[in-house]
Regions:
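N-terminal export leaders
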Residues: 1-3
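OB-fold/S1-family single-stranded nucleic acid-binding modules
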Residues: 75-97
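OB-fold (S1/OB) nucleic-acid-binding surfaces
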Residues: 35-52
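Short Cys/His-rich micro-motifs in 6-15 aa windows
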Residues: 118-129
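Short nucleic-acid-contacting surface segments enriched for D/E, G, S/T with interspersed K/R
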Residues: 55-72
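Short, cysteine/histidine-rich loop/knuckle motifs that typically chelate Zn2+
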Residues: 103-104, 115-117
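OB-fold and OB-like beta-barrel modules that bind single-stranded nucleic acids
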Residues: 25-30, 67-76
C-alpha cells in the first residue's frame, strides 16, 4: 500500500496547525468617548476597534482611558476594524498593563465596573509591563 503526501510551498512566514497568526501592532491615541465604538487616532486617521473578549472591549470604552497614548496588539479584520488582543498604555516610551482594582476588598478585575464583592467602583491602575505583577 502506497502512502502519498501533498507538499505545498508557500512564500513568506510559515504557520503550523494550531499556531496563532502573528499579531500586528498599532500605536496612537485612544478615543473612547465617541458613541459605543472605540477608535484609535493614528496620525490624521481614525481606526475602528473591536476586541477578542468582552472585558477588553469594555476597557477600550472606558472614558478614563480617553485620549491616552496606547499600544494595541491584534489582528486586522475583513470589515476594516482592528481586533485588539493586548492593550498597553504608553508613558515616556514605556509600556504599562491596564487593570482594575478594588482597594476595599483587595480584588483585581479584568474590566471596568463595580467590584464583584462590595459593588464600589474599581480603580483604574497602570502597572509597568516589564515587572512581574503580584
Amino acid at each position: 500500500m502506497a502512502i502519498g503526501a501533498l507538499v505545498v510551498c508557500l512564500s513568506g512566514p510559515r504557520l503550523w496547525a494550531g499556531q496563532a497568526k502573528p499579531l500586528a501592532v498599532l500605536e496612537g491615541k485612544l478615543l473612547s468617548t465617541r458613541g459605543d465604538c472605540p477608535l484609535l487616532q493614528i496620525g490624521g486617521r481614525e481606526q475602528t476597534l473591536s476586541a477578542n473578549t468582552p472585558y477588553l472591549y469594555q476597557t477600550l470604552q472606558d472614558k478614563r482611558l480617553d485620549g491616552r497614548e496606547v499600544r494595541l496588539e491584534g489582528l486586522p479584520q475583513p470589515d476594516g476594524s482592528f481586533q485588539v488582543h493586548w492593550l498597553y498604555t504608553v508613558h515616556n516610551g514605556k509600556l504599562f498593563k491596564v487593570r482594575y482594582y478594588c482597594p476595599v476588598c483587595n480584588i483585581v478585575a479584568l474590566g471596568p465596573g463595580n467590584c464583584v464583592c462590595c459593588q464600589q467602583p474599581t480603580e483604574l491602575q497602570e502597572l509597568p509591563a516589564d515587572k512581574p505583577q503580584s
